[in-house]
Amino acid sequence: MNETLKQELLQNIREVKDYPKKGILFKDITTLLNYPKLFNKLIDALKKRYTPLNVDFIVGIEARGFILGSALAYALGVGFVPVRKKGKLPAHTLSQSYSLEYGNDSIEIHSDAFRGVKGVKVVLIDDLLATGGTALASLELIKALQAECIEACFLIGLKELLGIQLLEEQVKTFCLLEC
């Protein structure tokens, strides 16, 4: 990815102090989405990265991973699979719990997400990688369906929260912007 694109992206991601709670500096990508030419450049850069890998599906983590993942899946001409919070998918699902700062949460994927085909190649995508809990749980769901996650992709990776290091122990991890 070229440095000019990275700078453009950084300039168009809003930072919101004390959201969703005091002490957090939230990276809001909705401002980036307001600029179609810049969003297209982002998706084109990701398409260039993933086209040679012949992926079968893009797996997006709720909710902003749906935005990036759907656009990338369309650009690549492959299927899109959502990973959602527990209870949000209508058919039979697999569930994975993970730890949060104060308690636990669960995410789910449809049990037929990859059309019953084993060994498909997928890219996992979300807007931001912080502690890595949701991404690691998503990776477990992908493995449970006997798919191969060839890379986990994030627009932003927060280095100080160590999610990048944790995830890299399990899968190749790409963060376009490291903050």
UniProtKB/Swiss-Prot annotation:
Keywords: Cytoplasm, Glycosyltransferase, Purine salvage, Transferase. Pathway: Purine metabolism; AMP biosynthesis via salvage pathway; AMP from adenine: step 1/1. Pfam families: Pribosyltran. One of its GO terms (cellular component) is cytoplasm. It catalyses: AMP + diphosphate = 5-phospho-alpha-D-ribose 1-diphosphate + adenine. Gene3D superfamilies: 3.40.50.2020. One of its GO terms (biological process) is purine ribonucleoside salvage. It comes from the Bacteria. Homodimer. Catalyzes a salvage reaction resulting in the formation of AMP, that is energically less costly than de novo synthesis. HAMAP family: Aden_phosphoribosyltr (MF_00004). Belongs to the purine/pyrimidine phosphoribosyltransferase family. This is Adenine phosphoribosyltransferase. It comes from Helicobacter acinonychis (strain Sheeba).
